[in-house]
Amino acid sequence: MSFAKSCKNELSRIEINRECCERAELAAFIHMNGSLTIKGDVTLHLTTENPAIARRIFRVFKSRFKKEMQILMRKKMRLQKGNSYSLILTGKNTVSLVLSNLEITKGSFDLNTGITPELVANRCCKRAYLRGAFMARGSIANPDASYHMEMTADYEEYLDDLIKVMQYFELSPGKLARKKEYVSYLKDSEQICEFLNIIGAHKTLLDYENVRVMKGMRNKINRLVNCETANLQKTVVASLRHIKNIQTIDENLGLTQLPKSLQEVAIKRVEYPEANLKELGELLEPPVGKSGVNHRLRKLEKIAEQLHQTGYYDENNGYLQ
C-alpha cells in the first residue's frame, strides 16, 4: 500500500463530532473533486480510487443531507490496478440545494471559485477543510524517497484561498502551475509533519517521523563514513609521499646519516604506512604530538627534494640540525 493511500485510509476513519466540521470537510471534497453533467437532468459526480474515501463521503453526505448518493464501481483496464468509485447525485433541485448549502455555488449553479470564509470560520473547520481537500486531491510521497506533499486545484483563486488556510497554521506552502492545474506543495519535512497533525493523520505522522529519523541517521552515518574514507585517502596519499621521500634519502644518503629523531620517524613511517600523524607520534619514544611529527616529516621532505634536485646533500643547509 502506498504511503498516500495509507494516510487517506486513516483520514477516512476519523470521527466528525461537529456539524460545522462535517460541512467543511464535505464542501472541500466536493469543491475539489466534483463535476457536473447536464443531460436532461443535472448530475453531480464524485470520483475516487480509494474505497475507504468513497464510503466516508457517502456516510458524511447521508448524515448531512439525509440523502444517499449512488455508488458505482468501475474496474480498470487489465494493465491498471485497482478500481474506480463514482458517487452520483441526480436531480437539478437536489444538486442545487447541496451545492448552495456547501457554499460551492451561488445562485443557479454559478460556481464560487474561492473558499467562502464562513466555511472555515472556526479553527476546527479549517482542519476539517484541509482534510477534505487532501482526501480529494492531495498526495504525499513516501519519505524514504523524498519529502513532498501537494494538493491540486482547477482554479488559482481557490488554491490561493486554500494556501491562506494553510498559512493560518503557520505553514509555508509553495505554489506552481502545472498544465491546467494549480499546485500547493510542502517540501520541508517538519512542515509536512505539522500538516499531517493538523488534518488528524496521527498514525501516519508517527510513521513519517520514524522514517524521517531513520533516514537522518542513515545520512549521518553515510556522512561519517564518507568523511572517514576521505581522511583515510588523505592519510594514504600523504603516507606514500613520505615513504617516497624516505626511500630517496635512504638510496642517496642513507638513513644512518640522519639525526636520531628523523631516523626514528622515518623507520616508523615505513613500518606503519596506514597510521595517521597522531598514531605515528604515539609510536615514537618518547611520544610526539601531531605538530612535532609533521615538523619532522617536512624536514625529511626538504632533504629528499634537495637530493632529488642536486644528487647530493649539503649539510650546511641546516636540515639536519
Curated annotation (Swiss-Prot):
Keyword Cell membrane assigned: no
Purpose: Involved in cell division and chromosome segregation.
Gene Ontology terms for molecular function: DNA binding
Database matches in HAMAP family: HTH_type_WhiA
Record-linked SUPFAM superfamilies: Homing endonucleases
Record family assignment: Belongs to the WhiA family.
UniProt keyword annotations, A-Z: Cell cycle, Cell division, DNA-binding
Name under which the protein is recorded: Probable cell division protein WhiA
Taxonomic placement: Bacteria, Bacillati, Bacillota, Clostridia, Natranaerobiales
Keyword Glycoprotein attributed: no
DNA-binding region location: 276-309
InterPro entries, alphabetized: Homing_endonucl, Sporu_reg_WhiA_N_dom, Sporulation_regulator_WhiA, Sporulation_regulator_WhiA_C, WhiA_LAGLIDADG_dom
Annotated GO biological process: cell division; regulation of sporulation
